[in-house]
Each structure stands twice: as C-alpha cells, then as structure tokens.
A protein has these predicted regions:
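Long, His/Glu/Asp-enriched segments that create or flank divalent metal/ion-associated functional microenvironments
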Residues: 194-211
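Coiled-coil termination/hinge junctions
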Residues: 186-193
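Charge-rich, well-structured scaffold segments of protease-associated domains
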Residues: 1-184
C-alpha cells in the first residue's frame, strides 16, 4: 500500500504491538499497553510523529473487506505459530492460570486469542458491526493523553524537538469522558488438552514459587 511504501522509504520501520509489564508492588498486578515503535533518522522526526498520529486516529476501522483480510491473515499466522512452537504454546497456556501477566499474554497471542480470531472470521457477517463498534470505542479508551508514555534512545541532537512533537501528538488524542473497563484475571487450575495435526505431544505444568 501507499502508506507501507511511504513508511519504508522514510524510516527504518514503524510497528504496533501489545505489551504487558508486571507490577512488582502489587501481587499479580500488571500494566497492559499498546505500543508504537519507530526507527528513524533525526531529520525524519516530524514525519514519524505525523504518521503515528495518522495511524492511531485515522485508520478506517469501518473498511469491512480489509478487516476480514486482517482476520484471515491473523488466523493463518497463529495456526502456524502455535503449532510450530508447541512447547511455548503449552507453557504459556499453563502459566496463564497462575500469573496475571501470562494470563494477559495468552489472551493476546495464545490459544484464547486464536479462538477469538477464528470465531470472528467464521461469523464475520453476523459480528462485523459489533466488532467495528468495539474497535472504535477501544481507540477512544486507549489513545488518550493520560495513557501516553514516551521512550527515546538518542543523543542530545535526537532529543531536540521531541518535546514539541509529543505535545502536538497529545493535543490530538481523545479526551472525551468514557466509562473504562479493566482486565480481570482469576487464578485457576485446569487439566486440558488440545489436538493438532502434529506428531509431537507437549505436556506442561506450571506453578508459582512465591506460593
């Protein structure tokens, strides 16, 4: 796409991901964040912040055909990743029952996430409107000034002008009042199995040393 070529011709890449950080002061506490990472030459700083703002605030979530393509692509990637790394899949699933951080990671990259994507893709016609509404609400909950954290690796020259760009970005983020939700993790003990086409079986047991 035009955006893809523009990003790659002017930067070293811009990527988005979900990240989870543990909270050492609170047992089973964690901080979940949507991160945008960019690599760029100092001369491209303004361009990078402009593109980040464009991606976060002007993405066409109502483009149903593209939304379905993304779901299908995610499903295929997950099918391959979860099967090829069966040992990691099993370990992550087991840990999700004893750790809030692992529980969140499992929901955004593990079997739970795969099941969600599979369900949305299989019943896209029935669920597309609800999905779009939820995505539109999520961007207004996530992309807010109070949620913004900036981390930069650069020398003095690279840091100059950063404050100005961050201020401009904060000014266009969402500020309307919305009811917020939260991630609720419940410790559990399950004995379960998952069948794949693979010939190798993986068994995982997890526990918390502090307990």
């Amino acid at each position: 796409s035009q955006l893809f070529h523009e990003i790659n011709s002017c930067t070293g890449g811009i990527s988005c991901a979900l990240q989870v950080f543990s909270n050492e002061k609170k047992e089973n506490g964690c901080v979940c964040m949507f991160s945008v990472q960019a690599k760029y030459l100092y001369s491209q700083q303004s361009f990078v912040f402009k593109i980040i703002s464009e991606i976060l605030l002007n993405s066409r979530l109502e483009a149903k055909k593209r939304l379905y393509e993304i779901l299908s692509s995610q499903k295929m990637q997950l099918q391959s990743a979860l099967t090829v790394s069966g040992h990691m899949t099993a370990a992550q699933r087991a840990l999700s029952y004893v750790s809030a951080v692992s529980g969140w990671q499992e929901r955004i990259s593990g079997i739970s996430y795969y099941r969600l994507i599979e369900d949305l893709e299989s019943h896209f016609d029935e669920k597309k409107e609800a999905l779009i509404c939820k995505l539109q609400r999520l961007i207004k909950l996530i992309f807010r000034p109070e949620n913004l954290t900036v981390s930069l690796t650069a020398d003095g020259q690279g840091c100059s002008g950063l404050e100005k760009e961050v201020k401009k970005l904060k000014e266009v983020l969402y500020t309307e009042s919305l009811q917020k939700g939260n991630f609720r993790w419940i410790a559990d003990q399950k004995n379960e199995g998952f069948k794949t086409s693979g010939q190798v079986q993986y068994v995982a047991v997890a526990g918390a040393f502090r307990k």
